[in-house]
């Protein structure tokens, strides 16, 4: 249950590091909060804030820095997430996209807490993708493929195994050993699901009902081609760069999470691009039943750029749970 706004306003703000965040949110909570917030996106209970970003060149490397924000009235929470995309970070043994979430009380504007949002971003992205893609299913989705075995790929496998009635999950990665590790992490979650690892993307997606791409490719790449897919496959593209071929963008029924954000992030959906004027609606429309799925045999492409209000919703719940558990570092004396 959401924390009492009056108590939140009076309590000292807290800081939660990555381990504390993990201790304060179960996988079930993450999936449920993300699903509910997505369904509520077109209501006055959830407000999407602005998304902004800019490029910075430092020591021969290019970084993208940005922020996403929003407000969840049911939790009396408003906030912002600051993130940086650094392709050099993995070679430094650092996360590619570090993130920090700041949550305030929506009624008073007082700081509620600050938390490490790096792993939580991967969790919410995967939960969002699985929830949105499953809502696009026109028949039982039994076979899934995940292309990419990084943090988001691991979380995708986990949420697929835990929340969907799939029979098989194939994980494809440049290194088969990396894909195998993603399978091992999810193996204990549910019996009856077959997990397989491969470095062959085409083989992984060939008979999949649903395909997720979540890689860190540095440039646009035809990782998944329309010709390899089932005629009615659902493809969910999550990476910063293009991970599917132009043919798929040109022929698929396209749904996005944030039309403006997707156009800002992905040139294919700007004027003149293959996806220009091909977006039929957003995820909230699908999940709330306001947008009906195509009746014929047609591929569906989900292009998800991320919605900041999901981070705020998860951050607010983590902070509320932390207070109940006595977890977190107080940032100032108690206001009560």
Question: How should these model regions be labeled?
Answer:
Residues 149-150:
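Glycine-rich Rossmann-fold phosphate-binding loop(s) that bind the pyrophosphate
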Residues 153-154:
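N-terminal Rossmann-fold NAD(P) dinucleotide-binding loop
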Residues 18-22, 241, 247-336:
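Adenosine-phosphate binding glycine-rich loop
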Residues 136-143, 230-231:
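Short helix-loop-beta connector
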Residues 1-122, 130, 140, 309-312:
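N-terminal ligand-binding/catalytic initiation module
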Residues 191-271:
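Rossmann-like adenosine-cofactor binding region
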Residues 143-144, 169:
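Conserved hydrophobic helix-helix packing surfaces used for dimerization/oligomerization
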Residues 162-189:
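NAD(P)-binding Rossmann-fold cofactor-contacting core
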């Amino acid at each position: 249950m959401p924390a009492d706004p009056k108590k939140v306003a009076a309590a000292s703000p807290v800081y939660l590091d990555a381990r504390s965040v993990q201790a304060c949110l179960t996988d079930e909570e993450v999936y449920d909060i993300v699903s509910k917030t997505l369904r509520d996106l077109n209501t006055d209970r959830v407000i999407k804030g602005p998304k902004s970003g800019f490029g910075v060149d430092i020591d021969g490397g290019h970084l993208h820095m940005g922020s996403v924000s929003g407000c969840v009235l049911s939790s009396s929470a408003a906030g912002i997430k600051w993130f940086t995309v650094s392709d050099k970070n993995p070679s430094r043994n650092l996360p590619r996209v570090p993130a920090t979430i700041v949550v305030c009380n929506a009624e008073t504007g007082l700081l509620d807490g600050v938390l490490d949002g790096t792993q939580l971003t991967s969790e919410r992205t995967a939960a969002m993708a699985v929830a949105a893609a499953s809502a696009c299913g026109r028949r039982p989705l039994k076979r899934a493929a995940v292309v990419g075995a990084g943090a988001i790929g691991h979380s995708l496998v986990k949420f697929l195994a835990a929340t969907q009635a799939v029979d098989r999950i194939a994980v494809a990665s440049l290194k088969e050993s990396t894909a195998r590790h993603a399978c091992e992490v999810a193996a204990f979650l549910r019996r009856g699901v077959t997990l397989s690892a491969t470095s062959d993307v085409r083989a992984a997606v060939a008979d999949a009902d649903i395909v997720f791409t979540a890689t860190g490719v540095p440039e646009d790449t035809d990782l998944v081609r329309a010709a390899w897919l089932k005629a009615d496959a659902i493809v969910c593209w999550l990476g910063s760069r293009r991970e599917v071929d132009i043919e798929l963008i040109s022929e698929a029924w396209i749904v996005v999470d944030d039309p403006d954000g997707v156009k800002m992030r992905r040139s294919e959906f700007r004027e003149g691009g293959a996806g220009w004027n091909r977006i039929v609606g957003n995820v909230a429309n699908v999940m709330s039943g306001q947008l009906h799925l195509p009746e014929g045999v047609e591929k569906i492409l989900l292009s998800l750029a991320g919605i900041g209000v999901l981070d705020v919703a998860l951050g607010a719940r983590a902070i509320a749970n932390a207070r109940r558990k006595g977890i977190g570092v107080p940032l100032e004396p108690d206001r009560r």
